[in-house]
Regions:
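Solvent-exposed loop/turn and edge beta-strand elements of beta-rich ligand-binding domains
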Residues: 1-243
């Protein structure tokens, strides 16, 4: 990044120029909480709130034009709900400024940009730009330790000295969503597969068990309960096969 400065000296002088840059932080709302964090767990079918927070450089006022483009890549295991909203946080208040930010969604990438941030009313060097949206965890979600990372970065103007085409990018910032799988094998006493069973999985929510998923009796002897978050579960054999 560049800094605009004016300096007049009469003798040899050493000057340290501060090259300030904006920051970008991607977070996901913790399951069952209003707090945002770097990683959490959800079940398939749940809508997941995400938040992106951008700060501005200390020399923001020096820019005649300020390019500001956020790209957010959603993994294949999530379905975007087309509900992005953009907010201006300043002095303890929050204002919806979504009308200044055209949104596009192509190839799992959300692009959020006003073109020139200077056209957005009320933005100051102390402001934060906050973006929120939701995405639903779908059947293509990755199970286990790899998670389903959601990645964002910011392209921004980095030279206030007249070169409007000069830009840089923030490092990628990531929020990860984990989901899990439970596999049940129904067998006879001799460990042979036994078809015809039916199972219902319950999760404890607010001290009560709520039905999550049911497998009806059939020819299967193996049951996969995919896309589970952490918590207390109860598995009930709802259909008992003969044998």
């Amino acid at each position: 990044a560049y800094t605009r400065f004016m300096l007049q000296v009469a003798t040899d002088t050493t000057v340290a120029v501060k090259a300030d840059v904006p920051t970008l932080t991607k977070q996901v709302q913790a399951n069952g909480s209003q707090n945002y964090t770097a990683a959490t767990e959800y079940r398939i079918g749940q809508s997941i709130p995400f938040q992106i927070t951008a700060t501005l450089p200390s020399n923001y006022a020096d820019f005649p034009l300020y390019k500001f483009t956020i790209k957010d890549t959603i993994p294949v295991g999530m379905t975007y709900n087309n509900d992005v909203r953009v907010y201006l946080q300043e002095g303890g208040t929050e204002k919806d400024i979504s009308t200044f930010f055209p949104i596009s969604y192509t190839g799992n990438v959300i692009t959020i940009t006003p073109g020139d941030l200077k056209y957005v009313q009320g933005v100051k060097v102390s402001s934060k730009i906050v973006i929120r949206y939701t995405a639903r965890l779908n059947d293509d979600a990755v199970m286990g330790a790899l998670g389903n990372p959601n990645i964002a970065n910011l392209t921004y103007s980095n030279n206030p000295n007249g070169n409007n085409s000069s830009t840089a990018e923030t490092p990628d910032t990531k929020a990860n969503v984990y989901t899990y799988q439970l596999k049940v094998n129904k067998v006879k006493e001799n460990q042979e597969a036994l078809a015809g069973a039916g199972f219902t999985l319950y999760k404890k929510v607010n001290n009560q068990y709520t039905e999550i998923k049911k497998f009806k009796a059939g020819s299967d002897s193996t049951f996969d309960f995919k896309g589970l978050d952490s918590g207390d579960y109860k598995l009930v054999e709802s259909t008992i096969p003969s044998g």
